[in-house]
């Protein structure tokens, strides 16, 4: 659906559910794809994401009381989810609207006043479970709605931090800051080079000329909560505690590759050693990839993407058969520069850099290989790099 069609669908459903549509407002917040720098954001490293043109949309209107009503066109079977002041229960709330409620809860925790409730209808065009940050998109959407409707004095980087806080503490997911920051701070045709230790960031133009970035979706649903994601964070923290005995560091992201290799044998557990190796080398690959993109060296950028995936597969162990099948099928093609999993892993999507004129052949050949091996089809999206949240 085009944006105008989405607004119309939201308005019609809003009228059907809540009656009066006078004074409703419309908002959007993007999803994101990470070009390189995976599982580095909670390790104090660098990430290199960009916001996407797909994301979450809402029609919303203030209420006169303190009640909230949420409805999603994507989860129509759930009906209207209502919440009064006493219906915000961290770590117990498992409905889709928990990502919105968590932000309201987090804002009040941070001393931002939410003076009244809202009626809201949502539509998202990020495939659920794709690893393109539908949850962060919802959090940034809710944050920007509250910022605009209630005139809250809060910056977009602060909205990203509120989204991360709510996902950690309300939804029970120990995510880093990357997803929310990429959604909140997106800039059209630019990637965000973010130092997650300091939140210092810069924009890097994505100049691909005769090349393009294709996102390939395994269509394997992943749910990070309760999966190995939180285990990886714990393992990384264990590695950091060991290495802090030998270096005055606050995060693994402070180490060079040489630092790590000089110290790696101090980590006796081979699993913990592998986790640390990924965190350190992936951070330094990300710094090198940003430089390669700025210099127009797409071959080097592609090589770094490949090394990133190999590390996520072998050292961090967050890939899966479906992701590896997509990556292997892509890399077998001579016009592909690099391919890697993107997002938390265990399913979701890959991101591939290739020659633009070959993109239809790429989709056909990868789709054939994937379905032959996995037994069901994958999907493709051309990455369209977008601005951050906005009122429509």
Which sequence ranges carry the predicted segments?
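C-terminal nucleotide
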Residues: 1-32, 57, 61-93, 190-338, ...
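Gly/Ser-rich oxyanion-binding loop with an adjacent helix/lid
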Residues: 2-27, 33-37, 43-46, 82-85, ...
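N-terminal cofactor/phosphate-binding cores enriched in small/glycine residues
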Residues: 37-39, 51-52
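Short Gly/aromatic-enriched secondary-structure transition segments
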Residues: 44-51, 232-233
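Short, charge-rich binding segments
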Residues: 49-51, 59-62, 111-112
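Short beta-strand->loop micro-motif that forms the acidic, two-metal-ion catalytic signature
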Residues: 347-353
């Amino acid at each position: 659906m085009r944006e105008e069609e989405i607004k119309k669908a939201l308005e019609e459903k809003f009228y059907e559910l809540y009656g009066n549509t006078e004074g409703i407002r419309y908002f959007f917040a993007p999803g994101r794809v990470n070009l390189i720098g995976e599982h580095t954001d909670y390790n104090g490293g660098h990430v290199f994401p960009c916001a996407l043109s797909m994301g979450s949309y809402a029609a919303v209107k203030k209420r006169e009381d303190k009640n909230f009503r949420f409805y999603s066109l994507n989860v129509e079977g759930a009906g209207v989810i209502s919440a009064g002041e006493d219906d915000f229960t961290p770590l117990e709330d498992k409905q889709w609207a928990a990502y919105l409620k968590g932000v309201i809860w987090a804002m009040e925790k941070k001393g931002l006043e939410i003076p009244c409730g809202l009626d809201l209808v949502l539509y998202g065009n990020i495939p659920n479970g794709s690893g393109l940050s539908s949850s962060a998109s919802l959090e940034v959407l809710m944050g920007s709605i509250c910022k605009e409707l209630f005139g809250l004095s809060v910056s977009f980087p602060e909205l990203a931090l509120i989204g991360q806080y709510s996902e950690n503490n309300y939804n029970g997911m120990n995510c880093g800051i990357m997803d929310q920051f990429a959604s909140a701070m997106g800039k059209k045709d630019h990637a965000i080079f973010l130092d997650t230790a300091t939140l210092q960031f810069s924009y890097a133009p994505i100049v691909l000329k005769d090349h393009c970035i294709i996102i390939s979706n395994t269509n394997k649903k992943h749910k990070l909560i309760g999966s190995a994601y939180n285990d990886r964070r714990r393992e990384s923290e264990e590695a950091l505690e060991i290495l802090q005995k030998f270096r005055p560091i606050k995060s693994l992201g402070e180490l060079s590759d040489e630092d790590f290799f000089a110290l790696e044998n101090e980590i006796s557990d081979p699993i913990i050693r592998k986790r640390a190796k990924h965190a350190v080398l992936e951070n330094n690959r990300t710094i090198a990839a940003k430089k390669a993109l700025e210099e127009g060296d797409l071959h080097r950028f592609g090589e770094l993407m490949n090394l990133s995936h190999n590390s996520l597969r072998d050292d961090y162990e967050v890939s899966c058969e479906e992701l590896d099948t997509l990556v292997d099928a892509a890399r077998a093609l001579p016009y592909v520069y690099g391919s890697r999993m993107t997002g938390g892993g265990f399913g979701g999507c890959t991101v591939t850099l290739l020659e633009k004129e070959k993109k239809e052949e790429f989709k056909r050949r990868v789709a054939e290989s994937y379905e032959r091996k996995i037994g069901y089809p994958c999907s493709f999206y051309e990455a369209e790099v977008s601005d951050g949240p906005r009122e429509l």
